[in-house]
Amino acid sequence: NISKQSLRTHKKVEELEKAFDEARREAGNAFGDDTIFIEKFIEDPKHIEVQILGDHYGNIVHLYERDCSVQRRFQKVVEIAPAPSLKQTTKDKLYEYALAITQYVKYDNAGTVEFLVDSDENIYFIEVNPRIQVEHTVTEQVTGYDIVCAQIHIADGAALNSPMIEIYSQADIQCRGFAIQCRITTEDPENDFKPDYGTIIAYRNA
């Protein structure tokens, strides 16, 4: 279980040896295992995820991408579909990579393939989330497909081109307009803005 306490960033080689020893010591004390991993640090990346649907018969399609770069305390706050500031060539690579990864493992479910994209639009793979994500609704808004409904039908054995799902090819999935989702979080301004709980006492639908 990775938390922000488990992550360290160092930009100078001369800091590395000391940081390495400290990180191993902390890991050993906290988890009983002093194994650590070193990764390339990507400064100010975009967090981009590609929505995937795959059935039991080898058919897999993407439903374009979401930009989840606006985050606070390592938690997503704003999600936008599609990503508003990526080149189309970069988006096409993201789709290609997402499909290649999921086709290789014969993926059959709704899922999300997550990437980081740096300022030069180099792409780095993070992980595959084999489930529905909270932000799937922005993808539903711009594609018109009910991802939750499709997932249930896939689990029941339906193919993507079945009457219940009606995705006959990648070309059937069109992206229209933009959708934005914002999450409401609670923080205590009198306690250094630490995460807090609260009660919603009023709600007004725009």
List PLM regions with ranges:
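ATP-dependent carboxylate activation and anion-phosphoryl transfer catalytic cores
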Residues: 1-206
